[in-house]
Amino acid sequence: MPNYHVTLQAAYIVRNVDDVEDAISVTISQIGKMLNKEGLNYVDIDIGLTICPKCGELVDCVLVVARTALVGVLLSMKVFNAESPEHAIRIAKATIGKVLKNIPLEPVDVVELEK
C-alpha cells in the first residue's frame, strides 16, 4: 500500500493578540503544545497564505479584529499504508482531529510518496 503526504487546512481563533505576528506566534505555540502533548510531534504546522485582492501579493492568512484573530493554519503529516488518497485524508483528519476538537479541518493537498 502506498504512503501519502497529507495537508489539511484549519481555521483557528486566537484571543488577546496585538497584531498579525503575535497571532501567528500564539497560534503555532498553542497548536504545537496540543499536538506534542498527545505525541503528534510529527505533524508540521505552517501558516496558510492567501492572495491580497488589491496588490496580488501572497500574504499570511490572518485576520485580526478587536484583539481577536482568525488564523488559517496548514497541518501536514505523512500517512503510511493507506489504501487510497481518500483513505489517507480520513486517517490524517482522524489523527489530528482527535487533538484539535471542534476545529474544522479540510484537505488541501494529498501527494503519493515514492517508495
Swiss-Prot record:
Q: Pfam families of this UniProt entry? A: DUF555 (PF04475)
Highest taxon of the lineage: Archaea
HAMAP family (alphabetical): UPF0212
Family of this protein: Belongs to the UPF0212 family.
Q: Which NCBIfam families match?
A: PRK03922.1
Q: What is this protein called?
A: UPF0212 protein MJ0068
Protein's organism: Methanocaldococcus jannaschii (strain ATCC 43067 / DSM 2661 / JAL-1 / JCM 10045 / NBRC 100440) (Methanococcus jannaschii)
Q: What is the lineage of its organism?
A: Archaea, Methanobacteriati, Methanobacteriota, Methanomada group, Methanococci
